[in-house]
């Protein structure tokens, strides 16, 4: 867990520093295995129909007929219509019941018209005594249903693969774990029988069964499949581990801290599913267009039928145009254009430690002008080392001043506090338990140690309260990149401590990448101006706001937004919550296993600045795929529907219902495959 996550609400600020893959049409309840089995069983019924029934009245070389063969065709076609056509008939019923007719209704209309008219043709040819032969559509019906089933089987496979990364995450957790019971006895139990505070043993190469803390042993953990962290992470006593990560070479004993739905993986999958079910503006638009497409297709189909009846007075040809228009129109390709990309995008993000909670953030990311970042823990490591400490009173020596600093900070998890306490421990300097400790927002904290009322404050507090202090010493230490805190007792400055933080290796590259994208990085920090400027100059950041109170960050974001600029704020999900909410995109960095942060639109599990660029890249690639799919889904229908209606019949370009079904299936498959090719970078 990152340090900037741990400091909770300790406003020490230097002391101030401190994204179901979607509903696929109306056949979401069908598993691709159902379409597969239906296809092969339907194939058994369809082959005799194809052999015994002429195509559009034209007998093909391989076709045969004999006395009673038309009865066999009728019986097999009826079975095929109700069995093979069932998914489409059921889907149409669902769509109509929700008053959202779409692809399933169009297909159901197409096969129903073909079947009913073929029944009429069968009656006319066998019972009416008419000398004229009425052409049936049994051949078209059989090929239509076969192609539709095959298309949906392939499509469901492609759709399933779009969310594959999420599926892989779900498979990371083992089914059993080795639990330690009385007298260190080991017992293999089901994961469902593991409870909080149980101790489990994980051997080399095994998956960590639950989130927990190592209580014995040390190892290297492979978290690549869980958080996207490519390097193995060394873990030892008291370190957090994530369920689903892979243990390296050592055997460790882990105390369980979260199970089931409270575990990291479950939270991530829940957030991703929620994000995938929320509709973005682009998706709402595509849904609307897909809805209109049904009425457009039916209208064009009926118009084409009437026009061809007037032109040719040929019911067979006119009916063929109607059926072809109904089956070639594909609102499904349009309806899936965005959800499939979203399923792929949010899954890839989760797999790489980028949890996209708010889908609209992906769209907004294309228009970001400024990215505002906290300094400590975002641009810097947040691991402070003490570089200088000194007493300003004859009554206390330097070590005693250090002890008072450590005492007052001992209950805090803020990075500065942790740095002081760890330094005191390293020098074997004892410290007392503080009493009546309170945060002073944007300043530091106050409390009582050994009956002394003390305050730890920053330089802004000294200036505002007119304290006398050595300004030359402050400037020298600050220019070296130190965060400086002062100890006050009885309105006297009695001590100083200076702590240095290290800039993260990937911060400079991140800033460079932002500038190359015409995005301006802005540093917002509670630290002193000298430290802020030193870090900013090293990173190449020209826009710096220092010595800020927590509420100042939010008002700065508002100021930038008032000029029409789009802002992304990157910071701690707890202390920076108001700023994250105020920004157009709030990105909580270094969440660790606590991904259920309310204030972030995007949650970065790691504290790696390069993930900011990864999010921007993923957003850009996602939008590119969405636009491609929308153009394909809309463009296909604009071209295919008029062709099916016979607009180019005068030059001999006529599409049969079977070809229409092939094109319709291909349109959806192309959209699915295009979504599947989405990559992080």
Curated annotation (Swiss-Prot):
Q: Which Gene3D superfamilies match?
A: Calcium-transporting ATPase, cytoplasmic domain N (3.40.1110.10), Calcium-transporting ATPase, cytoplasmic transduction domain A (2.70.150.10), HAD superfamily/HAD-like (3.40.50.1000)
- Compositionally biased spans, kind Basic residues: 1-13
**First-level EC class:** translocase
Please name the SUPFAM superfamilies in this protein's record: Calcium ATPase, transduction domain A, Calcium ATPase, transmembrane domain M, HAD-like
Q: Which residues bind Mg(2+)?
A: 572, 576
Q: Name the segments for region: Disordered.
A: 1-31
What does the record say about its membrane topology? Answer: Multi-pass membrane protein
Q: What does this protein do?
A: Involved in copper transport.
PANTHER family in UniProt:
ATP7, ISOFORM B (PTHR43520), P-TYPE CU(+) TRANSPORTER (PTHR43520:SF8)
Q: Please identify the protein, giving its name as recorded.
A: Probable copper-transporting P-type ATPase B
Source organism of this protein record: Staphylococcus aureus (strain MRSA252)
């Amino acid at each position: 867990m990152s340090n900037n996550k741990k400091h909770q609400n300790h406003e020490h600020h230097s002391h101030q520093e401190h994204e179901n893959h979607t509903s696929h049409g109306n056949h979401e309840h069908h598993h691709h295995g159902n379409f597969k089995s239906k296809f092969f069983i339907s194939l058994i019924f369809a082959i005799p129909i194809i052999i015994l029934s002429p195509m559009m009245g034209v007998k093909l070389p391989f076709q045969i007929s004999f006395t009673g063969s038309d009865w066999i065709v009728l019986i097999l076609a009826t079975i095929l219509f109700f069995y093979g056509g069932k998914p489409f008939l059921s889907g149409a019923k669902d769509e109509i019941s929700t008053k959202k007719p779409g692809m399933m209704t169009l297909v159901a209309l197409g096969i129903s018209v073909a079947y009913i008219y073929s029944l009429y043709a069968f009656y006319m040819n066998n019972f009416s005594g008419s000398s004229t032969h009425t052409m049936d559509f049994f051949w078209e019906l059989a090929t239509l249903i076969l192609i539709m089933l095959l298309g949906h089987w392939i499509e469901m496979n492609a759709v399933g693969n779009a969310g594959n990364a999420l599926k892989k995450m779900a498979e990371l957790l083992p089914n059993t774990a080795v639990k330690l019971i009385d007298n260190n006895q080991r017992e293999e139990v089901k994961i469902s029988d593991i409870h909080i505070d149980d101790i489990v043993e994980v051997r080399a190469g095994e998956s960590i069964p639950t989130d927990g803390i190592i209580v014995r042993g040390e190892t290297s953990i492979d978290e690549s499949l869980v958080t996207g962290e490519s390097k193995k992470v060394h873990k030892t006593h008291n370190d957090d581990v994530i369920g689903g990560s892979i243990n390296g070479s050592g055997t460790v004993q882990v105390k369980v801290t979260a199970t089931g739905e409270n575990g990291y993986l479950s939270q991530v999958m829940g957030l991703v599913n929620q994000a995938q079910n929320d509709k973005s503006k682009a998706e709402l638009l595509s849904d609307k267009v897909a809805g209109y497409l049904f009425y457009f297709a039916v209208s064009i189909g009926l118009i084409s039928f009437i026009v061809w009846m007037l032109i040719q007075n040929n019911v067979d040809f006119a009916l063929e145009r109607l059926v072809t228009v109904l089956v070639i129109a594909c609102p499904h390709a349009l309806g899936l254009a965005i959800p499939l990309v979203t399923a792929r995008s949010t899954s890839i993000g989760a797999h790489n430690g980028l949890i996209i909670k708010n889908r609209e953030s992906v769209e907004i990311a294309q228009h970001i002008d400024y990215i505002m970042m906290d300094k400590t823990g975002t641009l810097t490591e947040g691991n402070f080392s003490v570089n200088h400490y000194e007493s300003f009173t004859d009554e206390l020596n330097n070590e005693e001043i250090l002890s008072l600093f450590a005492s007052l900070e001992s209950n805090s998890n803020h990075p500065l506090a942790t740095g002081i306490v760890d330094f005191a421990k390293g020098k074997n300097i004892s410290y007392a338990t503080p009493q009546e400790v309170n945060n002073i927002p944007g300043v530091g904290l106050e409390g009582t140690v050994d009956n002394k009322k003390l305050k730890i404050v920053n330089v802004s507090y000294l200036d505002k309260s007119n304290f006398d202090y050595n300004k030359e010493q402050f400037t020298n230490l600050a220019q070296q990149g130190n965060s400086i805190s002062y100890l006050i007792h009885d309105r006297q400055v009695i001590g100083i401590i200076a702590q240095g933080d290290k800039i993260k290796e990937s911060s400079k590259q991140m800033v460079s990448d932002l500038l190359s994208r015409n995005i301006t990085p802005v540093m917002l920090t509670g630290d002193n101006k000298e430290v802020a400027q030193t870090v900013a100059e090293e990173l190449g950041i020209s826009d710096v706001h220092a010595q800020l109170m927590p509420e100042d960050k939010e008002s700065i974001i508002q100021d930038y937004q008032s000029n029409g600029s789009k802002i992304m704020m990157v910071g701690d999900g707890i202390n920076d919550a108001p700023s994250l909410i105020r920004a157009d995109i709030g990105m909580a960095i270094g969440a660790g296993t606590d991904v259920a942060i309310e204030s972030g639109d995007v949650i970065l599990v790691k504290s790696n600045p390069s993930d900011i660029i990864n999010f921007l890249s993923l957003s850009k690639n996602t939008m590119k795929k969405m636009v491609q799919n929308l153009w394909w889904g809309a463009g296909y229908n604009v071209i295919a529907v008029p062709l099916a209606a016979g607009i180019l019949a005068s030059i001999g370009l006529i599409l049969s219902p079977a070809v229409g079904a092939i094109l319709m299936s291909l349109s959806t498959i192309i959209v699915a495959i295009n979504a599947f090719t989405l990559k992080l970078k």
